[in-house]
Design a protein with these regions (language model features):
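Conserved catalytic cysteine-centered active-site region
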Residues: 64-72
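Glycine-rich "substrate-gating" loop/helix at the edge of Rossmann-like oxidoreductase active sites
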Residues: 45-47, 74-79
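Hydrophobic residues within beta-strands of alpha/beta enzymes
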Residues: 33, 69, 100-102
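Flexible, glycine-rich active-site loops centered on histidine and acidic residues
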Residues: 3-16, 78-102
């Protein structure tokens, strides 16, 4: 059975939180870590910060070695398909290939 984790990253998840979470996932039986790709809180909380989804995934790819990473969706309303493709390919190269889910 695949065990994966999804986090609503736009709800004030800091880089330190992402890093600790990815390390904990990689040390456990969790195969993949997914995050939402939203710029604003879906809970209507404007004060909540949000790191960019693909920048976060690329950074996590650099500090993990087995954890699969990705988003559930990436809205084309603010991510042009060619820019999204470039972001995903970049993350895949940083990950060493084969760990990025789209």
């Amino acid at each position: 059975m695949r065990v994966c984790l999804m986090i609503e990253g736009q709800e004030s998840v800091s880089w330190e939180d992402w890093l600790a979470l990815a390390k904990a996932c990689e040390a456990s039986e969790i195969e993949a870590l997914f995050r939402s790709d939203h710029y604003l809180s879906v809970m209507g909380r404007a004060e909540r910060s949000s790191l960019d989804a693909w920048a976060t995934i690329s950074a996590l790819a650099a500090v993990t070695s087995t954890l699969r990473l990705g988003t559930l969706v990436s809205p084309v309303t603010f991510r042009h398909p060619s820019v999204l493709a470039k972001n995903v390919v970049t993350a895949d190269h940083i990950a060493g290939g084969g760990r990025i889910e789209l």
